Swiss-Prot record:
Disruption phenotype: Reduces the production of PR-toxin and leads to a large increase in mycophenolic acid production. The chain crosses the membrane at residues 238-258. One of its GO terms (cellular component) is membrane. Keywords: Glycoprotein, Membrane, NADP, Oxidoreductase, Transmembrane, Transmembrane helix. It is found in: Membrane. This is Short-chain dehydrogenase/reductase prx4. The active site is at residues 194, 198. One of its GO terms (molecular function) is oxidoreductase activity. Its EC number is 1.1.99.-. The gene is prx4.
Length: 329
């Protein structure tokens, strides 16, 4: 059974009469907050499907790999180091690959040979306080490191490009899921560059969600808040939990990743360009699931519905007309 989204709606009181410009053709927003109830038993069988996961040897990537494997999929784990002994599912293959290397990523995809689901999960945290001055031996302002940019953004874009290329050539569609972050929506002041990059990954999903469905390819993101992984070990997560603040397990986030790859939706997030049918049943596409503790929330549909409120009714209308004029599809 393919899981289908069932919204839990919380109405927002919007004074639309004071916001609407009468000459604008945009429709009133459907202002709802959407909670999701995701259970592993709702994940359909994936026998014969091939899943590739970057950063798949630990944390969220490995948790997702185990869920995919229990559903019958064949897994390829792309990472710099193999999983710890006994942690990887039996029907998985580890491929050593640096996500910042185009050559290594190409070779990893070639070794996998076929791709039905691709999870761009590899990521690192910010390696230093970017906007504090540090100096070299000559006392000159030192250039900062860019591993967080290369891994989290460049690597994700390259991984996504290769996945989409394989799926298009295969002609059977597919699903791409990107591990973004809650900081992409609510920036963390101690991680300014990391937060900005994660916002960029959400932007990548938004930019591709109207074009990839032409090839029966969906693209979605998962935005984890505090999650127990190597980036947030238990000695740091413990005080958050002791304070009663929500912290997710890697399994909770991994389940959101798998759901994003296989679920279906009763309507699109939004129309783009020449599109005029919103209520179209299709693959789960162009969405982001926030994981906060044990709670899942889909973020993108509400943001899109409320665009006339925060972007402006006139601005929304004229921008959509510009998009329709330039729509190359």
């Amino acid at each position: 059974m393919i899981p289908r989204w069932q919204p839990a709606s919380i109405p927002l009181l919007l004074h639309l009469d004071t916001l609407r410009c009468h000459h604008v053709s945009v429709q009133p927003p459907r202002a709802t907050m959407t909670s999701l109830n995701i259970k592993e038993e709702d994940i359909p069988r994936l026998d014969g499907k091939v899943v590739v996961i970057s950063g798949g040897a630990s944390g969220i990537g490995l948790a997702a790999a185990n869920i995919f494997a229990r559903a019958g999929a064949k897994i390829f784990l792309f990472d710099c180091n193999p999983p710890d002994s006994g942690e990887a599912p039996e029907n998985s293959t580890f491929i050593k690959a640096d996500i910042t290397s185009w050559a290594e990523l190409k070779a990893a995809f070639a070794q996998a040979g076929h791709v039905d689901i691709a999870v761009a999960n590899a990521g690192v945290s910010e390696e230093q306080p970017y906007f504090e001055d540090t100096f070299d031996e000559q006392g000159e302002l030192k250039e900062p490191g860019f591993a967080v940019v290369d891994v989290n953004f460049k690597g994700t874009v390259m991984f996504t490009k290769l996945a989409v290329s394989y799926m298009r050539k295969q002609g059977k569609g597919g699903s791409v899921v990107i591990t973004a972050s809650a900081t992409g929506y609510a920036p963390e002041q101690n991680l300014p560059v990391y937060s900005a990059i994660k916002s960029g990954l959400v932007g990548l999903v938004r930019s591709l969600r109207s074009t990839l469905p032409r090839f029966d390819i969906s693209i979605n993101a998962v935005a984890p808040a505090a999650t127990i992984t190597k980036l947030l070990p238990m000695d740091i997560a413990g005080p958050l939990m002791a304070a009663g603040l929500p912290v997710s397990s890697a399994h909770m986030v991994g389940l959101a990743v798998v759901y994003s790859a296989v679920a279906r939706q009763p309507r699109m997030v939004e129309t783009y360009g020449k599109e005029n049918v919103l209520d179209l049943e299709s693959k789960w596409n162009g969405r982001t699931i926030l994981t906060l503790g044990e709670h899942y929330t889909e973020l993108e549909e509400k943001l899109a519905d409320l665009r006339p409120v925060w972007f402006g009714w006139r601005n929304t209308d004229l921008t959509k007309k510009q998009q329709a004029t330039a729509d190359f599809r």
